[in-house]
């Protein structure tokens, strides 16, 4: 039988001082943390009214295990340089921008796969529209060099 879980319940429980949970009064955050039943996901009532905040536990676990990392999302008006620098930083990389060219995205796109696949796909898309931008990845020192040949 599938159970529904409310994801924000525990966070609210931990952050709000004295709290009622399942009929008990908790006076300190330490007592809340000691409870074995209080994890990051706390079970509460089953209601269609809360459908937006409920997640079926099996579906939640499956989505976590099948998601590909890393994912790069770009939206219209994003600048490639800014987006690439922030995304690379999340994964411990530094971007060296060695070109005068700028790229602004017109559409929303999500790139998925391993780190190199994302950069290869991104470079391919940029080159297909006639912009000469390439990426060189140095994994040992975690640097991505962006350059133009022409």
Curated annotation (Swiss-Prot):
<dbReference type="Pfam" id="PF10671">
    <property type="entry name" value="TcpQ"/>
</dbReference>
<dbReference type="InterPro" id="IPR018927">
    <property type="entry name" value="Pilus_synth_Q_C"/>
</dbReference>
<protein>
    <recommendedName>
        <fullName>Toxin coregulated pilus biosynthesis protein Q</fullName>
    </recommendedName>
</protein>
<comment type="function">
    <text>Involved in TCP pilus biogenesis.</text>
</comment>
